Amino acid sequence: MPKRKIQRERPKEKFSYDPRKVLKMLDEHARRILEDIKAGKNPHFDIPMRGLSNVYFDEKSRLIKMGDKLSRRYFLNVAHARKFMQTLLIMAYVKRLVSEGKHASLREAYYANKHTIPGTRENTFEDQSESDPIIEDLERMFGVLREEMHITADRRGYIYGDIVIRDGEDEFNASRLGSGGWAVPGTVEHIQFPEINVDYALVVETAAMADRLIEEKFPKRENALIIATQGQASRGVRRLIHRLHYEEGLPIIVFTDGDPYGWYIYSTIKQGSINLAYLSDKLATPESKFVGMTMDDIKKYGLENVTEKLKGIPPNKKGGPTGDYKRILEEMNYPWFQNKEWQRQLQLALKWGVRIEQQALANKSLEFVAKEYLPEKINNGDLLP
């Protein structure tokens, strides 16, 4: 076997979780509002605008970022007053959560702040679709994750490997919790890693493939940490990946299905997403590499008979492109896929009209992916940028 090329790097960031910074920002904004009221001014919030018009790809940092366009929300404005009130309500709720060391889900945050305004028939919130955007506004205003404000989403994803995790007063090794590993919580800001005995992290799209690798002893034999995203990576998983790379120096290798959905999962982990452009510097990991599945794998490993047809209408047919074909053409225009390696893969997918799943490797044998496919590609540096 060739000499391993994957090894830990020098950390670029330090563990920096500090609830006090959120409390400080809340206090500063609240004091400014109070001062405006005392001075007879119209209180306002300046909030970075959401939407495509305020999003760009930064070539230097290789991240999808938010621009500098702002929208101003006034108290003494009929069109703004309701959202202004809702913003202050959520700010007060966040202060209480952080001060008391408690966490709440998005749904709990909605219900906790929903009530009828005294003397009226008006509710503060009618639906969670009103409270969620306010929380996103605060993220953009403060430049922090909602998880740092102690507001969480449902947990999804798990890790397995020789890494010691400290979660509050608990400390445990993620390779000694059974084959199910450690479920990644919605909030990972407070998690610390006293001991890491792996060379790199392998991010795996499907739980079935992650389970296969664990059963075949891949993490122990290859000295790797398995991170199962279970589909599109959650915010908690993306933040964990970012922290493991920048704070602990772990190289990140991504393993997904060879289809437009899998490639988008990789894109989101690597460059961030348009919807969360304001958090790319906390969630994205531009140094990530892609091991597969690729179109080249189909012929190299004799998988022609286990491919699946792309869904939709090809661009050269009436009514096309639609479905997978349309998505691939969109991905070909992503700035971060504007290199010959990725253009080749996407063009081959269009030309052949096929997709290839991770589980297709079982056609060779159940252990093939763990004992041949991944070790060969990773140790040979056969990775896409």
Curated annotation (Swiss-Prot):
Example GO BP: DNA topological change
Assembly and oligomerization: Homodimer. Heterotetramer of two Top6A and two Top6B chains.
Residues reported to bind Mg(2+): 205, 257
Active site: 111
An MF annotation (GO) of this entry: DNA binding
Keywords of the record: ATP-binding, DNA-binding, Isomerase, Magnesium, Metal-binding, Nucleotide-binding, Topoisomerase
SUPFAM superfamilies registered for this protein in UniProt: DNA topoisomerase IV, alpha subunit
One Pfam family linked to the record: TP6A_N
NCBIfam families: PRK04342.1-2
Catalytic activity: ATP-dependent breakage, passage and rejoining of double-stranded DNA
Record protein name field: Type 2 DNA topoisomerase 6 subunit A
GO cellular component: chromosome
PANTHER family for the chain: MEIOTIC RECOMBINATION PROTEIN SPO11
Cofactor(s) this protein cannot do without: Mg(2+)
Topo IIA-type catalytic domain mapped to chain residues: 17-158
Catalytic activity, EC: 5.6.2.2
Enzyme class: isomerase
Role according to the record: Relaxes both positive and negative superturns and exhibits a strong decatenase activity.
Source species taxonomy: Archaea, Methanobacteriati, Methanobacteriota, Thermococci, Thermococcales
Superkingdom of this protein's organism: Archaea
Family: Belongs to the TOP6A family.
